[in-house]
A protein has these predicted regions:
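Short, ordered loop/turn segments at secondary-structure junctions
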Residues: 3-4, 38-39, 75-80, 85-86, ...
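Active-site C-terminal subdomain of aminotransferase-like
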Residues: 124-139, 163-164
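Nucleotide/pyrophosphate-binding catalytic subdomain
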Residues: 3-113, 118, 211, 287-289, ...
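A conserved regulatory-domain signal marking ACT and ACT-like small-molecule sensing domains
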Residues: 139-308
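Short hydrophobic alpha-helical runs that function as membrane-insertion/retention elements
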Residues: 70-74, 128-130, 197
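Short helix/loop capping segments that flank catalytic or ligand/cofactor-binding pockets
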Residues: 43-44, 82-83, 129-131, 139, ...
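Structured helix-beta-strand junction loops
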Residues: 29-30, 124, 192, 268
Length: 308
């Protein structure tokens, strides 16, 4: 019966609204249910599986459909860690984290929940509690729409990062006067199916940060098109970059957070290759050489640990 409630379209995409209605109707009069995960049904009734995180996704879908007050996700860790345990020994567990903060950390490489498992409950403003099956006494991490009042004192929620990026640097005099220059540049990447991670710029310069792996197959063609179509004064590519994100909703209330981050990196004798910070001040992202990645993570974590 279960597969008839979790529904996929003919093209294999998940039909969230039809599924929400079907599960809601099926469970409306049931107090307790054991529901398998990972799969659902195509329009013709054949079984179709979720691509990743199937059991987590199923739990989230059911939580939304029944209007749950809380979605408990039991796993093998005691919650969201503030840093990568492969780099930081025994990083502390985050007690509360917002959906937005979690998305930033997950996108930058933190291994928590697959994004598809968060989306259904986020739409319904249902909190998630990540718990450890092997340590049920641990409170775990609560993923919430907004932080409780006491959590606003925390400046930094976590640090995450990822290696494997390249920077395509383009320079042209009077670039700022050419309407659509950056749009044209980004379209060249889009034509080859490459999305950009960040796009820091100056008056006459712009850098496109992309995945090195994604860039590799079309690298020469992209550089040729940039030269032919945009006529820049200079184009170069820097490989071997790592991106690091310092994430925290409380940073907006703390003066000097960015200055502190830059000072810590400088004191570690690491050169910052790129800086990006949104106006919402939810995160600060820097690029460093891959060879400096682990040292940068350790330096940042120990510097901000007491304000986490």
């Amino acid at each position: 019966m279960y597969k008839r409630q979790v529904l996929f379209r003919a093209d294999g995409s998940f039909d969230a609204e039809a599924t929400n209605t079907a599960i809601g109707h099926a469970l409306v009069s049931i107090d307790r249910a054991v529901i398998p995960g990972f799969y659902g049904a195509m329009p013709d009734g054949t079984i179709h599986t979720f691509s990743r995180g199937g059991s987590d996704v199923t739990g989230s879908i059911v939580a939304r459909a029944v209007g749950a007050e809380l979605y408990e996700n039991w796993t093998d860790v005691s919650g969201v860690l503030a840093a990568d345990p492969r780099i930081i020994e025994h990083p502390h567990v985050v007690d509360y984290i917002t959906y937005r903060e979690l998305r930033e950390l997950s996108y930058m490489g933190a291994s928590v929940l697959h994004e598809d498992a968060v989306f259904p409950v986020r739409r319904a403003n249902i909190p998630i509690n990540i718990r450890n099956t092997n340590r049920p006494q641990d409170p775990g991490t609560f993923i919430v729409p907004t932080l409780p009042a006491n959590a606003h004192k925390r400046k930094v929620t976590g640090i995450a990062g990822h290696k494997g990026f390249s920077s395509v640097y383009v320079e042209k005099s009077m670039m700022n006067g050419e309407i659509g220059f950056v749009a044209h540049l980004l379209q060249i990447f889009a034509d080859h199916g490459i999305s950009f991670e960040h796009c820091p710029s100056g008056i006459d310069t712009v850098s496109i940060i992309v995945s090195t792996e994604a860039l590799a197959p079309a690298r020469e063609e992209i550089l040729r098109r940039i030269q032919d179509e945009l006529q820049p004064d200079h184009v170069s590519v820097e490989d071997g970059l790592a991106l690091i994100a310092v994430v925290g909703q409380g940073m907006i209330y703390a003066k000097g957070t960015a200055a502190r981050i830059f000072r810590v990196i400088a004191d570690a004798n690491i050169n910052i290759r790129m800086i990006d910070q949104g106006s919402c001040e939810l995160n600060i992202i820097i690029a460093v050489k891959e060879t400096d990645y682990e040292l940068a993570i350790r330096s940042l974590y120990h510097a901000v640990e007491r304000v986490m």
